[in-house]
């Protein structure tokens, strides 16, 4: 059986935290900021943790990420 390759698109989008969870950035942060409130833009700056439902699939794609 060949080795599992890391999904490079996922590797660029997710980082593993110290406790083993996966951190992601928010969507809606690339353009069209004039239509968004200051509160929404401020909340989008912070990272978020990947939900439990998506965690298993993404973890499999990032098999070799330390």
Curated annotation (Swiss-Prot):
GO CC annotation, single: cytosolic large ribosomal subunit
Membrane-traversing stretches: none
Example GO molecular function: structural constituent of ribosome
Basic residues: compositionally biased ranges: 1-26
A UniProt-annotated Pfam family: Ribosomal_L35p
Keywords: Ribonucleoprotein, Ribosomal protein
Residue numbers spanned by region Disordered: 1-45
Keyword Ribosomal protein: yes
Alphabetical list of InterPro entries matching this protein: Ribosomal_bL35, Ribosomal_bL35-like, Ribosomal_bL35_CS, Ribosomal_bL35_sf
GO BP: any one term: translation
PROSITE patterns: RIBOSOMAL_L35 (PS00936)
Highest rank taxon of the organism: Bacteria
Keyword presence, ATP-binding: no
Family listed: Belongs to the bacterial ribosomal protein bL35 family.
Database matches in HAMAP family: Ribosomal_bL35 (MF_00514)
Protein name: Large ribosomal subunit protein bL35
Gene assigned in the entry: rpmI
